[in-house]
């Protein structure tokens, strides 16, 4: 594992010595990927600090769930590894929840990002369903799964599925805190080698 800043500095130097366009493009992609990761780390730290200080603002309103899912389907369909299918399951297109649009996007994006990272083959499914007075969201994958020893700590700060895969270790902590601030809860079911299923709930808005 190479920290993002080290990679940015290192490949910025290497690109000046690159002789072919292919080599320059390869280094540019690495720099861009690690720059995005570093920006995400800064944003995660800022959001965590705001949540802990109880100063993060939420714009709570009724949200049509299918609109969020269609946006995320378009955003993530090309980010899966070769041959992996991203599938938005059949859902109630008229279902609403109460929450902050941007924060719900942030939560599901984090779960989908993890699923694409840890699913080298098979399928990733996501969607939602009604559960009493709540909407239950889910992201299910056929990836590497999570060792039992890590499940208990995965939503704690710096809890990671795999120490050798790049990531901030803050994303799932943020997901938990954001979900709880909007009146829900988050959990997972997983078995090593058999994929993972992440769930979270938010209040259901009856039309």
Residues of each region from the PLM?
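Conserved C-terminal segment of the DHp
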Residues: 7-22, 26-30
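Short conserved segment of the HATPase_c
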Residues: 10, 146-158
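Short alpha-helical segment of the dimerization/phosphotransfer core of two-component systems
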Residues: 33-38
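Helix-loop junction within the histidine kinase core
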Residues: 49-60
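Conserved catalytic submotifs in the C-terminal HATPase_c
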Residues: 59-64, 81-95
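Short alpha-helical Gxxx[C/S/T] motif in the catalytic ATP-binding
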Residues: 171, 175
